[in-house]
């Protein structure tokens, strides 16, 4: 008896769809459209641990030990870089504006706070409210943004965020009081929360696969560009009449750029496909990618992902999806690693340093103008760290850069704390204090005005020749008079160790910048 001939061998056994029944000859899903060989992949075949990866159309397990394995990609299978067109350029510019807005808001508040404190006579608690109101609103609206994105689409959410940010920036620029300023900061936080969540998602769903990772990372990198720009603007406007209003109000420019840009951009193809508008999704991908096979493959991947989400066997809704991800070992490990890195980045104090950089430098002994310019310089150090990380990540590896970043952050924070201890030790002693300046409101110290460091920490109080009395930036109030040879210190005390604070602040932000991008790329 002659044995039957063997079945034909499929050249691509790990296709998302079986070769004998492809969904359409126009949209083949091939392994060559994968862009990152370092990702763990699988198609939900023999290995239970690979279930769920088929939505990306990637390879399956190795067939031996039931684990996902990296995809093997030949050099000639890497998708070519897409040709630039007006839609792609608009996508890059407008998505970058979202990151720029976030960075500008962070940096400009640091430079504006010293001027706002003197103009509106803010207490330390009120200063904290000016900063934290934006952060709280950002957190709340980032949670709301997920539902809004799924319901209304990415484009309307970003347009709404741009409009909200514009209104908030105008409100801050004309704020006549503390309450008005906090309200404007809260409105801005709502815009930041919506845009910072939606813009990277929109880029990931619209950008060609060959440059998708770079564009998404670019949105994060633009945060540092916004911080540096804000520092320069604050330095130029510090000391000018109403300068802090212009600092805050100029945020209308990038918000207008983002709003106008997204007005002319199409909706996300992923959202269109999920809404049953497949023809529109195809037209959007063709517009962004050009009429190439890559556009067809991208549409096929989008349709496969949408079909996966609609499958009753797969979890629907954020809670069920999270439970499913946590119960899947490879996904759970990746989730713990990613969330852990992000938590470490936030817990190391980056928000405190960025929002209060100018205040920190004032406490270290620098005047208002010098403190604002130094905060711009340290923001530039973070930008250098980000750029250096992007250049070195493929050579040194992500793990090495993240470990070096964390070590540098730890050393710099310890050094920064030591430098402030030295500043207090070397501060001039108070021999006489007026009734208005005889107590330190901060609970960090003993509650007694003992040093120049304590004195200048009290609103409308300054130090000269052992006296702690009321005054302003230039003169002493009342009958108190400084000794002729004494120098009036209102914003900061003379500190021979101030250079230490500068060194450790620069090291801190340089180290953080290295880990900021490396952690995201990991």
Language model features with spans:
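Alpha-helical transmembrane bundle of multi-pass membrane proteins
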Residues: 2-289, 307-522
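Short, well-structured alpha-helical segments
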Residues: 295-307
